[in-house]
Amino acid sequence: MDRAEKREFVAWLNGAFKESGSVVVAHYTGLTVAQMSDLRSKMRDAGGSVKVAKNRLAKIALQGTESEGIADLFTGQTVVAYANDPITAPKVAVEFAKANDKLVILGGAMGATTLNADGVKSLASLPSLDELRAKLVGMIQTPAQRLAVLTSAPASQIARVIGAHARKNEAA
């Protein structure tokens, strides 16, 4: 990589750090190419990205971003996972790390908040924004459904009473 390519890469990575909702940093020593491709495809399917970057370039790219506090995590063979949704990158990275012990979560950032490995794992256990929206819609719809059942119940009960009374009169 010559200087121009490095500048372009740092500018691109800086933009990715600024736009992302969360960033996860992990060691990937010992992962095979197939495992790394699997991680990338899972992250891409979830709406995130995985990037292997030189530590020095990643530290430069972090300057001027909210995630600047994670610069100390860039030692050794590191991989960066990031996504616009704050839950996506931690969730996919932690799930992948459970299946592949060679991916070791070092920490990350969510906005200006720096997270250690346990913080990333806690963040991964939270529901995503789409899941929360679905739960909220379900909670909003439930009272309306109950109200519809309650308002229709008295009318149907009255109809049953009248029908039973009519059958009783016919039998007599």
From Swiss-Prot:
GO terms for molecular function: large ribosomal subunit rRNA binding; structural constituent of ribosome. Keywords: Ribonucleoprotein, Ribosomal protein, RNA-binding, rRNA-binding. GO terms for cellular component: large ribosomal subunit. Transmembrane segments: none annotated. InterPro entries: Ribosomal_uL10, Ribosomal_uL10-like_sf, Ribosomal_uL10_bac, Ribosomal_uL10_bac_type, Ribosomal_uL10_CS_bac. GO terms for biological process: translation. Forms part of the ribosomal stalk, playing a central role in the interaction of the ribosome with GTP-bound translation factors. NCBIfam families: PRK00099.1-1. Belongs to the universal ribosomal protein uL10 family. Part of the ribosomal stalk of the 50S ribosomal subunit. The N-terminus interacts with L11 and the large rRNA to form the base of the stalk. The C-terminus forms an elongated spine to which L12 dimers bind in a sequential fashion forming a multimeric L10(L12)X complex. HAMAP family: Ribosomal_uL10. This is Large ribosomal subunit protein uL10.
